[in-house]
């Protein structure tokens, strides 16, 4: 993260005005590979991509390879089903934590952090913070040191897409069903055929 976005030297109120390499080197292409610590496979695969194809990989707006930083930790998190079900750990010593519930209320930044931790993992694929019971700190995002307390709980869960889709489908079903009921009543009064 230090080479990509300035890291601790750039954190407030540091007097150093630390910068990322891409803010200093403006006449050459720069690829940011943030993470604290970084994932070795991300480094090696990015280098191999350049050696094999002779070009930089596709990058996001922060100059990170989309193949590794294209989805959030949350998108691939093994605790995501608990998030969708609304099951959260409220403290590091409660029943929800022991059962492996989502760590969002314990400050997990996985929903807003783009990195490959949940798919590649660290230490030769052994684990990553959330799998080991620790909330994501958001270390691959700019300014993560200034992004609030690491264990500061999130006040309300983000929109849960699965539940939103279910709610929208249920609402549409109610509207269609009501429309059919009204049409059937009108048909019965007029002696027409039943609407299906």
Language-model regions, residue ranges each:
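Catalytic cores of nucleophile-dependent amide-cleaving enzymes
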Residues: 1-33, 37-39
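Iron-sulfur (Fe-S) cluster-binding modules
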Residues: 26-32, 46-196
